[in-house]
Amino acid sequence: MMLSRTCGYALLALEYLAAQGDGQPVASPLIARARGISERFLVKALTPLVRAGLLLSLKGPSGGYRLARPATKISLLEVVEAIDGPVRGDMPGALEGGDRLESRLHAVCEGAADLMRRRLGQVRLSDLAGKK
């Protein structure tokens, strides 16, 4: 499994917000500067997190982004799936004349995806931010 660049940007921003720990909204230009990310790409990465209910986007002069729940209650699986979609064990393309082999490989890939989902579900945003 490989995370998209957008997912990486989202994780950088979420870790920053979690490390702040005060629950106050942080403006996107500040997050972008702190993490060395283009603000345009940052907003693109944060929009699906707002839709998924992981972030709140607050308008106005003192607005910005803040976590919708405590960092201890947000798993990496939620973040990855909000950005990149479900973690799956798909195999690209079919193997010529290898139906049985393809079936066995599919089982291996699905097992690996199950392990990845389980592990991502165990790790919390607070773990990335070094907060408990």
Where are the predicted features?
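Key DNA-contact positions within bacterial/archaeal DNA-binding proteins
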Residues: 40
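Beta-hairpin "wing" of winged helix-turn-helix
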Residues: 52-68
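Alpha-helical residues within the helix-turn-helix
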Residues: 33, 50-51
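Short alpha-helical segments that sit at the start of domains
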Residues: 1-13
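Basic amphipathic alpha-helical segments that dock to polyanions
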Residues: 17, 45-50
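Non-DNA-binding regulatory cores of transcription-related proteins
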Residues: 68-132
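A short alpha-helical element within helix-turn-helix/winged-helix DNA-binding domains
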Residues: 25-36
